[in-house]
């Protein structure tokens, strides 16, 4: 059949077996087929003249998968026979991916005598790419007017922050002895190599304030559990940080430790000085400062300024609802009900998020309004590109090339940014019977405020949920696997409910069912029966408390028991459940509990009023 021949053709092309591909009989013309074969061919192509074909393909198909591999392939084919102007033109559109390509760019700039761009290219290579001993020596010798001792140190500093041992040591001949001592101390601390004290002693006093050394000492102490000793280093940290994310990870660990010790004043001081400027870590740091000020230092006014500033600078529904809900709580605690109500109303607009839903309750509303499906927007730019990827995915599924089809749909999802672009992806995913890819696309769209409720919250038939509420099962499955029955995590958790084989085996034994590991990913009912049974045992253990059972499903009951001991039991009146969730020490579990609970609110709404899911 055509399908089998097409399947064979793609298999040969994936392997780069062009002789067998040429020998295929009856390979009828098909537009999708020809384009996929061309794409696969260009990825493997080693002939010089295919450079132009790759450049054309990239220009005409901006959203195709594995764009970077195609760019790297083109870089390989940029031969010295090409005119320098062509080479420079290429790199002005595609920054070099490999060290070798970077050298080709530099050579072309030399030939055309473009000194300004040459200097930029040399510095960018020097500061961002892994180089051999020979390449380093060559650059230092040839470009010593640009690669000054200070620039040489900047490269070593970058390699040390990355933790690259060999590449750092390759730089030793080019730096001073004192800088070598500093580098050695940083590497020893970073990789827990031992003999750190003598290594630090060898660093001269004027270099001991080096950001990287302070950071590695701080992190080393925290890893060794020396939290008090680590804290001494926080008070004279540089105001400008090169790698703010790394600093925040350590600072957050210290703040959480202080909260555990009920040392709220110091925790607040450390949180206030977080120095984050943007992105996810800014949102987390700014929120933490506000929350500690409000809940543990009784400073509602100060807290509200943190939350309002956070609201202005974050973009995702999860962060905006979190900032506005807590701003409402801060104004409420400061006896300013009208302003508090205003902020709860802002938060409640984000009705698919945990804090948006809590704000809705704060406003005394029992009904939960889900976002309406948007009308088709005018921003349809790029929709034809996306539709093409979807049609190719459908074609690939029909000929039995599912893995490749998934790659095309996921790439389409990552590039889609409007309703008109996301809509065909969801239809395509449902058409090829991969609802988990529709969930994937719909969830990505929701971050941009584009909602597809029924695709985002599927309700497949469930046979046996062991008396556990269906809405809860769906909520866990959505967070665990996005409804992908074949999901497998890097830790080895399997299937819809992401069961660890050992857990699944003991549950099967208690239910007197035969245990079959393969069935965890091949039979979704089997996976749900075991997962629901395990979940039910957790709900019983925690006397009906969903938040505790959900936390235990993610982090294990031994951790939840530890947290109950430490922070109290949120099922009792004197312990605030929201604070309890926010005090969970593991970021992954905090996020997990909030995401499952927000799913639960939506699923209950969809199950009780099926019409709202249109």
Protein language model features and the residues they cover:
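N-terminal leader/linker segments that initiate helical-solenoid repeat arrays
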Residues: 1-40, 369-389, 398
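The tetratricopeptide repeat
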Residues: 4, 37, 70, 101, ...
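Structural register within alpha-helical repeat arrays
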Residues: 8, 38-41, 74, 105, ...
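Residue at a conserved register position within TPR or TPR-like alpha-solenoid repeats
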Residues: 12, 45, 78, 109, ...
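Structural motif corresponding to the intra-repeat A-B loop/turn of tetratricopeptide repeats
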Residues: 15, 44, 48, 77, ...
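Alpha-helical positions within canonical tetratricopeptide repeat
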Residues: 19-20, 49, 53, 66-69, ...
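Solenoid-like repeat scaffolds
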Residues: 22-32, 43-46, 55-65, 76-79, ...
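Catalytic glycan-binding domains that act on GlcNAc-containing polysaccharides
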Residues: 30-32, 39, 54-61, 201, ...
